[in-house]
């Protein structure tokens, strides 16, 4: 390689040297020695020439090429004027490309993420079969497990896909051929669990409960006693309405009866503190793009090891989503059976680090602070919430749409979007609502800004 200011001196122009970011003392010594030995011929040697000389003397140089760099050497006022006119706009353009617009997602997920989580996706290309990547996945599984229990008692199994895929993994893998499943349905996501069971033609029944009122635990207990159920499936946080189901109580009721519990914690995990042993949860599903505050594309199933090992040898209802097969293969190889989303897992790793720093308890307190701001403005404006305050999750709030003819959700949504707020509609039977979620990297001052927007919109 050659370094020269004269294009005719080089066979091919690779890049232009505009500065040195790092120079070792050894390289500097080599440059100085070369300059000293040629001082008589070149008393005003330029540093590029000395650098070339150092290279010829055996010093290894490493060049980092920076694409789209806008620069101008400024030696006088004319250079400054030219730089201001021609170069500064290019610099500003390059900077605008790098900036990430701050969007406050008040939809139930994917959630708002930190810039550090976004940038974690910009990583070196790597084959996911490399041991280095396998070790990172092992770290992710272990750290996720530590949020909900002890590693010796619980295991986390990763899949590429959405939270619904994790639900399907659990329902299709955890109930044996001779098992009988009871599914609690009090919203769209409980209904989804039932749909999955029906697709696989499983032996199951559905316990119907109000979509916006607390589950009657006495009635549920009678239902559990009536049938010969081996497993129960339920949703911890019903995202349709923001209703928080009493899973710890339900879990204890099931374990007292020898029933295995399968819980959708897609929009509860990493917000509501969960201890699987304390809360009597055997299997539970979640995803990377909700309260863990990562990017969409990875889901995971938390497993009681004893119950997981009981699945060994069970006939497979499907291939890709088989829980035990995925667990066993990863345990032996530190690889998933099929290609994992490399960049999304890097982002999840960063999200886990940030969750550990904040702690789940502090995160739930932050979410609750944002929810309190929302509840106050809803009351102030005379709007109504679908679910009673004491039965809400503090994470998602379903608000009844006003009957005022001036109200239009589309207009409300579009005006909010102009101010970088994204909101979400919600329909529950014949009840029209809009939903406000306060999960993700949302701060109380941003919820205050949204509250002010609501005041301006509903009082216009």
Which residue ranges define each predicted feature?
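Conserved core of the sugar-phosphate nucleotidyltransferase
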Residues: 1-40
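A glycine-/small-polar-enriched, mobile loop at the entrance of the PLP active site in fold-type I
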Residues: 102-159
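Active-site C-terminal subdomain of aminotransferase-like
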Residues: 112-113, 289-377
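Conserved beta-loop-alpha segment that forms the PLP phosphate-binding cup at the N-terminus of a helix
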Residues: 153-182, 186, 190-194
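Active-site phosphate-binding strand-loop segment of PLP-dependent enzymes
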Residues: 215-270, 283
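Conserved active-site segment immediately N-terminal to the catalytic lysine
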Residues: 277-289, 299
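Conserved PLP-binding catalytic core of the aspartate aminotransferase-like
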Residues: 384-415
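PLP-dependent enzyme catalytic core of the Aspartate aminotransferase-like
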Residues: 432-460
């Amino acid at each position: 390689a050659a370094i020269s200011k004269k294009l005719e001196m080089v066979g091919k122009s690779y890049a232009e040297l505009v500065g040195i970011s790092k120079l070792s003392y050894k390289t500097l010594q080599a440059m100085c020695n070369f300059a000293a030995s040629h001082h008589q011929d070149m008393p005003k040697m330029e540093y590029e020439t000395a650098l070339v000389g150092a290279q010829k003397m055996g010093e290894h140089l490493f060049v980092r090429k920076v694409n789209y760099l806008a620069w101008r050497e400024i030696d006088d006022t004319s250079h400054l004027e030219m730089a201001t006119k021609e170069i500064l706009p290019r610099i500003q353009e390059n900077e605008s490309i790098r900036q990430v617009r701050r969007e406050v997602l008040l939809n139930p997920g994917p959630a708002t993420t930190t810039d550090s989580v976004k940038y974690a996706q910009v990583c070196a290309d790597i084959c996911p079969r490399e041991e280095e990547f396998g070790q990172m996945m092992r770290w992710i599984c272990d750290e996720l497990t530590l949020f909900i229990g002890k590693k010796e008692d619980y295991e986390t199994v990763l899949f590429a896909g959405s939270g619904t895929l994790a639900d399907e993994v659990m329902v299709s893998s955890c109930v044996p051929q001779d098992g009988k499943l009871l599914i609690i349905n009090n919203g769209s996501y409980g209904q989804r669990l039932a749909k999955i069971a029906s697709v696989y033609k499983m032996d199951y029944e559905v316990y119907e409960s109000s979509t916006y009122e607390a589950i009657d635990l006495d009635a549920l207990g009678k239902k559990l006693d009536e049938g010969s159920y081996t497993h129960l499936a339920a949703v911890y946080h019903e995202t349709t309405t923001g209703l928080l189901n009493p899973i710890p109580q339900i879990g204890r009721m099931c374990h007292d009866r020898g029933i295995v519990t399968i819980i959708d914690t897609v929009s509860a995990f990493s917000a509501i503190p969960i201890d699987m042993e304390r809360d009597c949860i055997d299997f539970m599903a979640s995803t990377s793009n909700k309260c863990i505050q990562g990017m969409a594309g990875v889901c995971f199933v938390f497993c009681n090891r004893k119950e997981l090992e009981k699945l060994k040898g069970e006939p497979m209802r499907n291939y890709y989503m088989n829980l035990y097969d995925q667990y066993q293969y990863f345990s032996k190889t530190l690889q998933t059976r099929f290609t994992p989303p490399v960049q999304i897992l890097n982002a999840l790793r960063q999200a886990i680090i940030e969750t550990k720093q904040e702690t789940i308890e502090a995160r739930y307190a932050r979410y609750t602070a944002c929810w309190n701001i929302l509840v106050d403005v809803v009351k102030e404006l005379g709007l109504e919430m679908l679910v009673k305050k004491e039965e809400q999750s503090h994470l998602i709030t379903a608000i009844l749409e006003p009957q005022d003819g001036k109200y239009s959700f589309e207009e409300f949504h579009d005006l909010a979007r102009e101010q970088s707020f994204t909101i979400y509609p919600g329909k529950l039977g014949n009840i029209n609502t809009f939903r406000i979620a306060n999960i993700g990297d949302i701060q109380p001052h941003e919820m205050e800004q949204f509250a002010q927007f609501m005041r301006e919109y509903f009082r216009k």
